[in-house]
Structure formats: C-alpha cells, structure tokens
Amino acid sequence: MIQPDNEESWYAFKIFFGKGKPIKAYFVAKGIEHIYDVKQEYWDKNKKKSLLKEVPIMPSLILFRTTRTEAEEIERNFLNKVMLYRGKNSENLKEPSKISEREVKIFNIVATSGVEGLDFYDEYNPKFTKGDKFRVIEGPLKGAEGYVVRIKKDHKLYVSIKGLCAVTTGYIPKAYLQKIE
C-alpha cells in the first residue's frame, strides 16, 4: 500500500562520514522535527590537553518527521551524504521505511536519557526480540519498553526501531521493571 504523499511520518537517514551537522542545520532552518542529539565528551588526542567536544549520540543515524515526498527530496539534496532507509512494500517495491510514532518515542526516551552504559547498534537484530517484554516503571528510563537480553554476561534492556537500529542500556534493577503481558 502506498501512503499519501502529504501525510507526515517519521523516517530515518543513514549519515555517511560524519555529515550530521549540515543535515541537522538544514532541519533546524526548515523547522523539520528531528532527533539527532549530541553529548559533551572530553577528547584527549595527545594526552597533553583535553578538549570538550560535541559527539553525536547516534553518529550514523538521524530520525526526522516529514512527508514522503519531502524525505526523498532531502535525500537528493544531500546526495552521497545520506541514505534514506527503505523497505519493501506489499508489491515488493522499495519505498521509504515509515517509523511508528510509538517506536520513535520509546527509542528517544532511552537514547536521550543521558544514562551511562548505552550501546548503539546500527543494525536491528531480531534474535534479541524473543522472550518477555518489559516496561521501565522507575528511574531515568521510565516509560521505555523493550526486551531484557543477555549481552556479554550482563542483562540489558534492548530497545529497537524494527528493521533499523537498536540501543541497549546498562543494568536496570528488577524492581524498576514491569512485565508486559
């Protein structure tokens, strides 16, 4: 089913070679809602002096809300700098992958929480979406939903945007988790 061109949805760009700043500036100038957050990090190149540097939380991904037509136009404007994520539709044709509002909201809770121990994955891994689903009911990640998985001998909450990317948290106390039936 092809969606109407004037309907706004969430889409994602894969960003090449650290070209996130000009794309973010474009979105800000055009007033396009987007998610491309940065964190402050101390960077010590030669162990002589450290610099405070802005580092993207998700260096190769920017989420944005716009129409399908505008998303494809932005991709053409930033040729060789970004790639619009695409999936196959019911007619087996590739079209821009629409991301649900709920997935973006939950992913954003975790990605922008500022908690330590977040790991980002450029690829969605369906093997981590088996088992019981949980909701975080307390703490800085309150409202996040995902699967508790074991990675490198640690239990982590795995939150994903299906078919696109994922983030895992550090340790979350069991008292903060509620099983979703």
Regions found by a protein language model. Give the residues of each.
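Short coil-to-beta-strand transition motifs
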Residues: 128, 137-144
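Short beta-strand-centered aromatic/proline hotspots
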Residues: 143-151
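Acidic-enriched and Gly/Ser
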Residues: 1-133, 155-158, 163-178
